[in-house]
Amino acid sequence: MKIFDYEDIQLIPNKCIVESRSECDTTIQFGPKKFKLPVVPANMQTVMNEKLAKWFAENDYFYIMHRFDEEARIPFIKHMQNSGLFASISVGVKKAEFDFIEKLAQEKLIPEYITIDIAHGHSDSVINMIKHIKTHIPDSFVIAGNVGTPEGVRELENAGADATKVGIGPGRVCITKIKTGFGTGGWQLAALNICSKAARKPLIADGGIRTHGDIAKSIRFGASMVMIGSLFAAHEESPGETVELDGKQYKEYFGSASEFQKGEHKNVEGKKMFVEHKGSLMDTLKEMQQDLQSSISYAGGKDLKSLRTVDYVIVRNSIFNGDRD
């Protein structure tokens, strides 16, 4: 098995067939809807909130609302659907969450997307939740995770998941690999690659994205959608406190299993950091799209499919050659 991560890989260009990168199509059909980009902000409190979720839906971008304000979920679904927008929510696997799914069914509230969101998704509890959702609200598109193995992908798909999230602790504010010794940190792209060999349904690459080029690499190695946390954090529109440090503006960014999210120091697998203020989120999305269009042009195609078949070389952490200094 080849082991590598994003910084170890360089994709090899093919002959360009477009006059301009603007001809390249970055749209993706994911579940019942088509989106402008194959990216989704991480469903974290310092990355996504209701206001941003509405803006993303209005502008044909995918989003997943976090699950850390449980009482707000039903009003959120109603508000989004009454506004003619899609509802995309997260659930956990505790007993109350099973009751919540039944309540949605009773009220005939059908979110277009439901993400089962726990750190170790290859588990009986997630499999039971997938089956529970598919029994009570079968029309919802179910995303389950997170996993890091082909066996995990197969089991969640067999249980009824419509898509699977791949990634155990590779994110900047996730310390699972340090606290537990387990995870895909340092080999996330290889984990995605081996999981894609088993997948029959879409995969979401979750974690470890440091540059826009990593989006193209994720698609090459099997992702349909790419979940991004730190690159989407710390914008003008982002949730989170703004602080000034040494004359520069920063915003807080913390992991979903951090004590800052949990409100207690118990089973902590996330940390908090401050990310330098990045300006407008709209500008970042525009740049992300342009960079992905350039990736498609280098791949010798006109749409995302062309990225899936390009050749690559493994260069072992050398592609930056001091560019980060």
UniProtKB/Swiss-Prot annotation:
Its EC number is 1.7.1.7. GO terms for molecular function: GMP reductase activity. It comes from the Bacteria. It is an enzyme of class 1 (oxidoreductase). Signal peptide: none annotated. InterPro entries: Aldolase_TIM (IPR013785), GMP_reductase (IPR050139), GuaC_type_2 (IPR005994), IMP_DH/GMP_Rdtase_CS (IPR015875), IMP_DH_GMPRt (IPR001093). It catalyses: IMP + NH4(+) + NADP(+) = GMP + NADPH + 2 H(+). SMART domains: IMPDH. NADP(+) binds at residues 203-226. The active site is at C174 (thioimidate intermediate). GO terms for cellular component: cytosol; GMP reductase complex. Belongs to the IMPDH/GMPR family. GuaC type 2 subfamily. Catalyzes the irreversible NADPH-dependent deamination of GMP to IMP. It functions in the conversion of nucleobase, nucleoside and nucleotide derivatives of G to A nucleotides, and in maintaining the intracellular balance of A and G nucleotides. This is GMP reductase. It comes from Staphylococcus aureus (strain Newman).
